[in-house]
Amino acid sequence: MPKRNDIKTILVIGSGPIIIGQAAEFDYAGTQACLALKEEGYKVILVNSNPATIMTDTEIADKVYIEPLTLDFVSRIIRKEQPDALLPTLGGQTGLNMAVQLHEAGILEENNVTLLGTKLSSIEQAEDRDLFRNLMNELNEPVPESDIVNTVQQAIDFATSIGYPVIVRPAFTMGGTGGGICHDEKELVEIVTNGLKYSPVTQCLIEKSIAGYKEIEYEVMRDSNDNAIVVCNMENIDPVGIHTGDSIVVAPSQTLTDKEYHMLRDVSLKIIRALGIEGGCNVQLALDPHSFNYYIIEVNPRVSRSSALASKATGYPIAKLAAKIAVGLTLDEMMNPVTGTSYAAFEPALDYVVSKIPRFPFDKFEKGERVLGTQMKATGEVMAIGRTYEESLLKAIRSLEYGVHHLGLPNGEAFELDFIKQRIGEQDDERLFFIGEAIRRGVTLEEIHEMTQIDYFFLNKFQHIIDIEHDLKDNVGDIDHLIWAKKYGFSDKVIAHRWNMTEKEIYDIRHENHILPVYKMVDTCASEFESNTPYFYGTYETENESIRSDKKKVVVLGSGPIRIGQGVEFDYATVHAVWAIREAGYEAIIINNNPETVSTDFSISDKLYFEPLTEEDVMNIINLEQPEGVVVQFGGQTAINLAEKLTKYGVKVLGTSLENLDRAEDRKEFEALMQRIEIPQPLGKTATSVEEAVANADFIGYPVLVRPSYVLGGRAMEIVYNEEELINYMTQAVKASPEHPVLIDRYLTGKEIEVDAICDGETVVIPGIMEHIERAGVHSGDSIAVYPPQTLTEKQIATLEDYTKRLAHGLEIKGLLNIQYVISNDEVFVLEVNPRASRTVPFLSKITDVPMANLAMKAILGESLISKGYKDGLVPYKEGVYVKAPVFSFSKLKNVDITLGPEMKSTGEVMGKDITLEKALYKGLVASGLQVKDHGTVLITVADKDKAEALGLAKRFHEVGYRIMATSGTAKLLKENDIPVVEVSKIGNEFNLLDVIRDGHVQIVINTMTKGKQIERDGFQIRRDSVDNGVPCLTSLDTARALLEVIESMTFNMNQM
């Protein structure tokens, strides 16, 4: 069927900021879809609030709106642009929910906008738990016994009738938000109360738990001619009960019999046909391991996290083809872009095994609730490809960057066996590693199966890995055993550990004996058709399919899995660097392991290696490809940390030299540089022991900022106010040593400023200066940033420009540079310098029209910035005001304190732009999910040191018509100053402030940290209850002031005559 000619302009809705449950996979899908629609001749208008994406680059769509994804703003864009059609199925849950809202508000009908892809009735049938259950009953397909509830009492009544445990699934949410498994009434009340709040239609499904069944997924596609295919089927190693986003997944499925595979395949195709979905769809099924009984768990009528994984696992570009299906093309008339010789209607075939492991944020949030359930907690994921299951699993494990390199924990032998068994039974994020440890200790597979319900197939594979370990130990130096271990994915590091050698010694033994990996092509067809995709994975076999070309090559290291502190911004920089390399006439080779991202789309680079970002795996590729050099400055800390290791092998690091990368990180060298170029920095010292830390802090004077050296995202960084807190930090948060010193700095309160620059060795281009709303002490990634700066003097701006140039020359920067400054008592100090891409690169590139990553890469390759039309110094400001606001995923992470500080906690970002600061801030806050209301109730409970400042804010809240609630101390101060206030009791009394928050009487909570970090602290409880009840909680008075300015700008002045 030919494509539709009755539509010319299509509006695509993006998925907004990165949050747990909705990550970089939608940037990948949206980018593919927009380009596919443009390829077919349509005019594409994109709306998305996330500036950190490739998708929001002006080249991707004909018109790009970076605006809040709310009914109000999307409606305005529809009225202005008058698109013919809307494609909502590429924007995750956000896109689907927006389509439903636009329909219900009459906006689509009023503006004659057609919905493409999946019909609204299909979306509602798949997403509304009641309609979905009814459809399954009509199809005679089994769903677990369930009921739809709109109140807590209905949930209690139903759960009592069918018996616990039950699973709660809120309607129209993603990542299992608000859901969970309940083992008793207490858990049910808590989870359903939350679930009803998070569901936009106040509806939850309560279903009989089938935890323990196998969880199987089918990624299916269908077109308007009713051609339907299975792109990929996947098996969760963790049985039903753990959200698929938090499960370890393998593709293709490993334990299904042919009968089971085809039974579930037929069911999946039957469901996509019944729903009438045109495009991609994900079907999740539960299979009884002991019979042919199965249940339908749910259907996602859109492109999803699983479809990104399926695309990368097979090479089959689901989002691209789904977009073309949406405009009427069919599978049997589109070529498969991978092979170029077969049609898209051929189902992909795999001759390898793919493993996906989630990446969790618990290295950031050590006190977070680690137990896994139906609510997702992972921020990202890694994928690895191997010829055996063992190989793909071990490659995935070493891609995680947790400090684990194998099936076990770094000091696993120190744990008691009882503790290991307890952790296996707890079903948390480290269970896989504890299973490895248990097998090492001789725990039987029967006992592990009993505790986990993990299929024996996988447990036997884990056993096989441990058996190979034992064989290695018993046969030190034996080449046959080395080859055998390499075939099953063992790294040189692990073999070196077993043989009591160094990793370099194993590397040398391999090279002497020609034990080298070959690279196989991912071609969607198991080599059945001719294919020339430049997409490879490494394995230890004989035939190498990756042929080295004669062109000059540059290798770019990607940034690995999405995690807090290292988000999609680094993938953005990586992609632009790769494009710049290709423009400059070099062959661009990328190494990365994240299935969600644009950088791992094989059409981006000349060659893609889907491999772990470790010394060994990267060196294997470099030895084969012989590049001019490697670029590390776009891949975040992941890539920077590899620079020194690669240099030892004689690899050339392109751009800023290793020596200068180290100079920016090494305390003493950096201080010497700062003195030489005469730039002030806060007084600081280094400590390698507790005693030295105490002495240094006494000399500097409290409060001090303490942190380990060489980290990203402010990991384990804290402000401490006295000796007791310092000792606590030194003994619990870090292990200081001569190799790993702790940095201790005077903590300066003042205005924080962030500057990004590009240098070619001579010219220093400064695209922009950003001013943070929150004063120094809040991590830059968690601050609201404003461009251009609103309160700086010309003298301060000139100083910032001068210091930035001095630093760029002093560090001999070639490429990018990011500097954080603090202005304290009108003096500019340097806080830190990062000689690499920063998380502000996409934001600044978009708002200044300076293609930062592209220019930096050209500078690295030796081109001058002047030849590109840029002058030395600060680029003239663009018109308007631009705000970058952080977005947090606290609602998904229990027991995590939301207080902002020097350690980063946000998962994503949004942008607001307008002609005034207040309007831009309004857009930024609304886009980040904050409901800005011009009236309501604000609860103020602050530390003593903040009371004087809070008084001024309270007065202004009162003047705009807000009611004020406060606890006794704050209330007393307000009354003394004639500000009306409702006093509420502290925690522990009847009807206290937690009741006020839980009962929905409060619209905003302002709570600043009272020292003492124990979880039981009242402050922690207030902040957690705010998050769990969907009430904005501001822990910085600067953020509160910004919000207040927005509310004031929305408020009319009411004065009596």
Curated annotation (Swiss-Prot):
Chain sites annotated for binding ATP 2: 707, 746, 748, 752, 777-780, 820, 832
Gene Ontology BP terms: 'de novo' UMP biosynthetic process; glutamine metabolic process; L-arginine biosynthetic process
Chain positions recorded as Mg(2+) 4 binding sites: 832, 834
Domain ATP-grasp, residue spans: 133-327, 671-861
Residue span of region Carbamoyl phosphate synthetic domain: 547-929
Binding residues for ATP 1: 129, 169, 175-176, 208, 210, 215, 241-243, 284, 298
Keywords, alphabetical: Amino-acid biosynthesis, Arginine biosynthesis, ATP-binding, Ligase, Magnesium, Manganese, Metal-binding, Nucleotide-binding, Pyrimidine biosynthesis, Repeat
Cofactor remark: Binds 4 Mg(2+) or Mn(2+) ions per subunit.
Binding-site residues for Mn(2+) 2, renumbered to this chain: 298, 300
Binding site for Mg(2+) 2: 298, 300
Cofactor: Mg(2+); Mn(2+)
Residues annotated for Mn(2+) 3 binding in this entry: 820, 832
Record-linked PROSITE patterns: ATP_GRASP (PS50975), CPSASE_1 (PS00866), CPSASE_2 (PS00867), MGS (PS51855)
Catalytic activity, as annotated: hydrogencarbonate + L-glutamine + 2 ATP + H2O = carbamoyl phosphate + L-glutamate + 2 ADP + phosphate + 2 H(+)
Transmembrane stretches, start-end: none
Cellular component GO terms held in the UniProt record: cytoplasm
Ranges where the record places region Carboxyphosphate synthetic domain: 1-401
Residues covered by region (Oligomerization domain): 402-546
Binding site for Mn(2+) 4: 832, 834
InterPro entries registered for this protein in UniProt: ATP-grasp, ATP_grasp_subdomain_1, CarbamoylP_synth_lsu, CarbamoylP_synth_lsu_oligo, CarbamoylP_synth_lsu_oligo_sf, CbamoylP_synth_lsu-like_ATP-bd, CbamoylP_synth_lsu_CPSase_dom, MGS-like_dom
Family stated for the protein in its record: Belongs to the CarB family.
Function text: Large subunit of the glutamine-dependent carbamoyl phosphate synthetase (CPSase). CPSase catalyzes the formation of carbamoyl phosphate from the ammonia moiety of glutamine, carbonate, and phosphate donated by ATP, constituting the first step of 2 biosynthetic pathways, one leading to arginine and/or urea and the other to pyrimidine nucleotides.
The protein's name in its UniProt record: Carbamoyl phosphate synthase large chain
